[in-house]
From Swiss-Prot:
It is found in: Nucleus; Cytoplasm. This is RNA-binding protein 42. It comes from Homo sapiens. Gene3D superfamilies: 3.30.70.330. Residues 236-480 are annotated as: Necessary for interaction with HNRNPK. Its main location: nucleus. GO terms for cellular component: cytoplasm; nucleoplasm; nucleus; U4/U6 x U5 tri-snRNP complex. Residues 345-356 have a biased composition (Basic and acidic residues). Interacts with HNRNPK.
Length: 480
């Protein structure tokens, strides 16, 4: 076995080399691989720069090969050296700057909800070259290209009808975009200077089309107001004249200067240079901006006319005007004048005697007046209590019936001359249910030393009006 030569089928043996399975188709040569790499580089640069690069051949569609198992001889054959294309020195920097610029532009613009444009391949791109897009470089280039595409913004919808007052807003858009405008100042009105109006609106924020509310384009507030006339300056009484009115403009000029400084400070804070001098424009309605008629001159005190006192305004002058007082009657000589206070309106009303209600009673053909009935409630439920002892008074009778919730009053009738009890009294209730319970439970109970007898009170039947009404009814019926 030691003198045996190499086995047949190995390199160096005299026998033929037995090819392995699938070795009938040769592998890719170095030129084919070089062409594939050049095609991949050209595709990458076209994806990044968006145009074919001159001097580099386009990609050649590769022939799909069947994967083979390399043999030992094929593995030992040295491969041809691969020649890579030379890239210019500034190519990487130019591509990097382009990518950074497009990424910055894409970061400031919010892409719309609509999908991006479809992908279009380079010239000469065939279906067989789609396998080259699976590489990480191609995917990154495709992602950067899609991010760098500027999104399409939806057009701004304008209303079909715009009032003539708002049509001037379109002309003011150019001035609004150029820089900040001076704020419109509120004119002084009746010696009052209002605060400055809010500054002009800044540039619109980068929002998607659906984020802003629909409406007319933004414009200046001053362009929306019609031009009005300047209102009259505030007037103040002069020092030396005293009988006329004099215009005073120093306060108005000082207020306007202060407002101009405030508007300039706001304009500088907003980022723009301060514009020209502020223009005072009327911001009040036409009815309020019209000049008011001059008031009539009022008679002034002598001190103001002579210049001893400072000038006064109209409200102060009205308070200083003497009010006419009624002349006091002078008392006769030798007597002192005494001030008698006049009675007030309430005292006059109280002094009038109110019409008292008279309670006229009638029974057994006689009539009399009983003012004690005014102490009782006219809408109560009253019980007559008879057979009372001499020791029973109002407190004892009230203590006996006070256990009922709606108990109002109890009274024992006495003789006016002697003060002795007449042997009966009355108890009043507000609730009819308590009235019925008292009639049922307290009848025959001892109050003092005697049992009392209860019955319904007939006090209403003895009123003169009720008696006459009943008599008329009886006459109509023919009973009497």
């Amino acid at each position: 076995m030691a003198g045996a030569g190499p086995a047949p089928g190995l390199p160096g043996a005299g026998g033929p080399v037995v090819p392995g399975p699938g070795a009938g188709i040769p592998g890719k040569s170095g030129e084919e691989r070089l062409k594939e790499m050049e095609a991949e580089m050209a595709l990458f640069e076209q994806e990044v720069l968006g145009a074919p690069v001159p001097g580099i051949p386009t990609a050649v569609p590769a022939v799909p090969t069947v994967p083979t198992v390399p043999t030992v001889e094929a593995m030992q054959v040295p491969a041809a050296p691969v020649i890579r294309p030379i890239i210019a020195t500034n190519t990487y920097q130019q591509v990097q700057q382009t990518l950074e610029a497009r990424a910055a532009a894409a970061a400031t613009v919010v892409p719309p909800m609509v999908g991006g444009p479809p992908f279009v391949g380079p010239v000469g791109f065939g279906p067989g070259d789609r396998s080259h897009l699976d590489s990480p470089e191609a995917r990154e280039a495709m992602f950067l290209r899609r991010a760098a595409v500027a999104p399409q913004r939806a057009p701004i919808l304008r209303p079909a009808f715009v009032p003539h007052v708002l049509q001037r807003a379109d002309s003011a858009l150019s001035s609004a975009a150029a820089g900040p405008r001076p704020m419109a100042l509120r004119p002084p009105h009746q010696a009052l200077v209002g605060p400055p109006l809010p500054g002009p609106p800044g540039p619109p924020m980068m929002l998607p089309p659906m984020a802003r509310a629909p409406g007319p384009p933004l414009g200046s507030m001053a362009a929306l107001r019609p031009p009005l006339e300047e209102p009259a300056a505030p007037r103040e009484l002069g020092l030396g004249l005293g009988l006329g009115l004099k215009e005073k403009e120093e306060a108005v000029v000082a207020a306007a200067a202060g407002l101009e400084e405030a508007s300039a400070a706001v304009a500088v804070g907003a980022g723009g240079a301060p514009a020209g001098p502020a223009v005072i424009g009327p911001s009040l309605p036409l009815a309020l901006a019209m000049p008011l008629p001059e008031p009539e001159p009022l008679p002034l005190p002598l001190e103001v006319v002579r210049g001893l006192l400072p000038p006064l305004r109209i409200p102060e002058l009205l308070s200083l005007r003497p009010r006419p007082r009624p002349p006091r009657p002078e008392p006769p000589p030798g007597l002192m004048a005494l001030e008698v206070p006049e009675p007030l309106g309430e005292d006059k009303k109280k002094g009038k005697p109110e019409k008292l209600k008279r309670c006229i009673r009638t029974a057994a053909g006689s009539s009399w007046e009983d003012p004690s009935l005014l102490e009782w409630d006219a809408d109560d439920f009253r019980i007559f209590c008879g057979d009372l002892g001499n020791e029973v008074n109002d407190d004892i009778l009230a203590r006996a019936f006070s256990r009922f919730p709606s108990f109002l009053k109890a009274k024992v009738i006495r003789d006016k001359r002697t003060g002795k009890t007449k042997g009966y009294g009355f108890v009043s209730f507000k609730d009819p249910s308590d009235y019925v319970r008292a009639m049922r439970e307290m009848n025959g109970k001892y109050v003092g030393s005697r049992p009392i007898k209860l019955r319904k009170s007939m006090w209403k039947d003895r009123n003169l009006d009720v008696v006459r009404k009943k008599q008329k009814e009886k006459k109509k019926l023919g009973l009497r």
